[in-house]
Amino acid sequence: MKWLRYLLGEGLLYRLYRRRILKEIEGLAKPQHVAMILDGNRRWAKLRALESSAHGHRAGADKIHEFLSWCEEQGIEVVTLYLLSSDNLGARESAELDDLAIIIENLADQLSRFSNWRVKHVGSTKELPQHLRDTLAGAAERTSKNSGLHINLAVGYGGREEIT
C-alpha cells in the first residue's frame, strides 16, 4: 500500500503530471493575480468518515503552502485565498468556527514567517474573534515591508454587505 501512496501522492505520477503541466504552460502569458476559493474541505472529511470537518480544513490548509510556492515559482505576483466568507460566519456552528479560526490563525502566522512573502487580510473583522483579528493584523504588520509574493487572506469577506 505504501507504493500506491508513493505513486499517487508526491511520487512518480505526480512528478510526471507536474512536468507535463509545466511544459505546456512554459512560454505562455501568466496571470499576475490568482484567486482561489478554498471549498470542499468539509465534504472531503465527510467522504473519509473523519470525526470532524476540522480534519478536512486542516488538510486543505496543509496544501496551501505548496500551492503558494508553485505560484511564486511561476512568477505570479498576487494570490488571494478565500478562506471564510461572512455568510459562513453566520451559518456555521460555533465549534466549527472555533476550529476554523485556529486553523486560519496558524496559517496566517506560518505564512508571515516564511520567505519574503507579504500577507494581508481582506474582509471585515467585525464578526471575527479578537484572537483571529490580532493574528491577521500581526501577520500583515510583520510582512508589510516584504517584497515577495503578495498573499491576500480573505476572511470575513462577502459582497452582500456592500449592496445598498
Predicted regions: what is each one?
Residues 1-164:
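Flexible, compositionally biased loop and terminal segments
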